[in-house]
C-alpha cells in the first residue's frame, strides 16, 4: 500500500486513542521507522507528511540523509555503541537510547551543541532488551546534571511482544510514572517532558498512557529490507 494511505489509517487510530484518553492528537508525533526500507520509500513517507524519521544504524542514517529531500527530523532509535557516537550525535535531533554513563560521556565529548536524549528504560525487565532498570534512572539523570551538551528530553521504553494488553499497559504506565518523578527533580538539563513508547503493535495503548512520540515501522512504511544492514 501507499504510505499516504497507511498514514491516514494510523492517524485515525491515533485520533481514536486520544479521544479515549482525553488527549489531543497534536500531542503525539509519529516517527516513521525507516531502517528496513529504501531511501525512496522513506521519501514517500516524508512526502505523505511525516516529519520525523527513525534509524538504528549510523551508516544507513547518513546514507539516507545524503539522498533525501524535505529536511525531515532525524531520530536515532537503536542501541548506540560508544565508538559510533561520533558519527551520530551531530547528525540527529534526538537519540532515543541513552542507557549508560560511558555513552553519555562520549556524547558529551563529541557534541558540537545540545543533544536531546531519551533515557532508555527496560520496564519489562526482559534480558533481551537494552535499557536501565527503573531504580537506576533518577540517580543516572542526577549524575548528568554537569553535562553541558546533554538535554534529557524524556524517557523511552519498549513493551514486550505479547497479546497481554495488561502487561503492555503496565510497562507504559510505569514509564509515565517514572517520568513524573524525574520532572520533580527540577533539573535544568532534564525537563523530561516527552515519552517515546509504542510501536506498530501497541501504539494505541502507549497513547492512552501518555506517549508523545510513537515509533511506527511495518504498518506505515512496510518492511521491504531496502536499507543497508550491518
Swiss-Prot record:
GO terms for molecular function: pyridoxal phosphate binding. The modification N6-(pyridoxal phosphate)lysine is found at residue 35. Belongs to the pyridoxal phosphate-binding protein YggS/PROSC family. Pfam families: Ala_racemase_N. Gene3D superfamilies: Alanine racemase (3.20.20.10). PANTHER family: PROLINE SYNTHETASE CO-TRANSCRIBED BACTERIAL HOMOLOG PROTEIN (PTHR10146), PYRIDOXAL PHOSPHATE HOMEOSTASIS PROTEIN (PTHR10146:SF14). Keywords: Pyridoxal phosphate. This is Pyridoxal phosphate homeostasis protein. GO terms for cellular component: cytoplasm. Pyridoxal 5'-phosphate (PLP)-binding protein, which is involved in PLP homeostasis. It comes from Bacillus subtilis (strain 168).
Amino acid at each position: 500500500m501507499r504510505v499516504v494511505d497507511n498514514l491516514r489509517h494510523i492517524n485515525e487510530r491515533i485520533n481514536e486513542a486520544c479521544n479515549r484518553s482525553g488527549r489531543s492528537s497534536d500531542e503525539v508525533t509519529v516517527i516513521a521507522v525507516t531502517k528496513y526500507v529504501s531511501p525512496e520509500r522513506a521519501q514517500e513517507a516524508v512526502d505523505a507528511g511525516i516529519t520525523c524519521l527513525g534509524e538504528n544504524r549510523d551508516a544507513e542514517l547518513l546514507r539516507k540523509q545524503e539522498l533525501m529531500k524535505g529536511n525531515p527530523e532525524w531520530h536515532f532509535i537503536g542501541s548506540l555503541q560508544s565508538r559510533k557516537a561520533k558519527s551520530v550525535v551531530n547528525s540527529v535531533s534526538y537519540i532515543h537510547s541513552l542507557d549508560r554513563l560511558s555513552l553519555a560521556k562520549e556524547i558529551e565529548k563529541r557534541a558540537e551543541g545540545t543533544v536531546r536524549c531519551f533515557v532508555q528504560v527496560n520496564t519489562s525487565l526482559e534480558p533481551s532488551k537494552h535499557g536501565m532498570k527503573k531504580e537506576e534512572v533518577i540517580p543516572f539523570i542526577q549524575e548528568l546534571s554537569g553535562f553541558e551538551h546533554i538535554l534529557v528530553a524524556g524517557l523511552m521504553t519498549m513493551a514486550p511482544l505479547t497479546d497481554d494488553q495488561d502487561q503492555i499497559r503496565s510497562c507504559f504506565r510505569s514509564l509515565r510514572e517514572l517520568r513524573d518523578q524525574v520532572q520533580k527533580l527540577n533539573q535544568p538539563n532534564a525537563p523530561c517532558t516527552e515519552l517515546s513508547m509504542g510501536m506498530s503493535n501497541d501504539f494505541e495503548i502507549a497513547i492512552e498512557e501518555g506517549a508523545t512520540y510513537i515509533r511506527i515501522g511495518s504498518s506505515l512504511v512496510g518492511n521491504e529490507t531496502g536499507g543497508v544492514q550491518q
